[in-house]
A protein has these predicted regions:
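Conserved beta-loop-beta/alpha segment of the NTase-like Rossmann-fold superfamily
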Residues: 81-156
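Short, glycine/charged-enriched secondary-structure capping and boundary segments
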Residues: 21-23, 65-68, 93, 132-136
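N-terminal glycine-rich phosphate-binding loop and ensuing alpha1 helix
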Residues: 2-67, 76
Length: 156
């Protein structure tokens, strides 16, 4: 059986949100955050582990609000998006203070992801069907790729 990983980008600064930590803000009737729904749907679809990409300054709140609870249900790992963690040959301009975005966030998790994976935003709702489609794609024909690459982008 092929294992699959759900990578959740949760290091955003939410500059347009207007206060608070957007990805940790309750939206559900019992205080659920959007990630609660995504992780539940991903587990139901067959995902085996979660890698959260966060910032160090969010770690304590993040673990208290969701991480410690989720790791009782599914294995959890943490990657930290650092402003200066760039590919070889690149340097951060001195005036740069914001994270680099999706590509750099995913690179932050490269040492932790060992299986086929899907990447989602922490503050977007995808629905169960999206996770079923992603998981089914990741496990289809596993190990039969001849060029070493199997890339897919799904937009929801």
């Amino acid at each position: 059986m092929v294992k699959t990983t759900l990578v959740i980008m949760a290091a955003g600064i939410g500059s347009r949100f207007g206060g608070g930590i957007k990805q940790l803000t309750p939206v559900g009737p019992s205080g659920e955050i959007i990630m609660d729904y995504s992780i539940y749907d991903a587990i139901e679809a067959g995902f085996d582990e979660v890698v959260f990409i966060i910032r160090h300054d969010l770690e304590k709140d993040f673990k208290e609000i969701i991480g410690n609870r989720i790791e009782k249900v599914i294995p959890v790992k943490y990657a930290f998006q650092e402003l200066d963690d760039l590919p070889e040959g690149y340097e951060r301009p001195a005036e740069r203070t914001k994270p680099w975005g999706t590509g750099q966030a995913v690179l932050a998790a490269k040492e932790l992801v060992e299986h086929p994976f899907a990447v989602i935003n922490a503050d977007d709702y995808y629905g169960k069907e999206a996770f079923v489609k992603l998981h089914d794609y990741l496990v289809a024909d596993a190990g039969k790729k001849t060029d070493g690459y199997d890339i897919c982008m799904a937009g929801f």
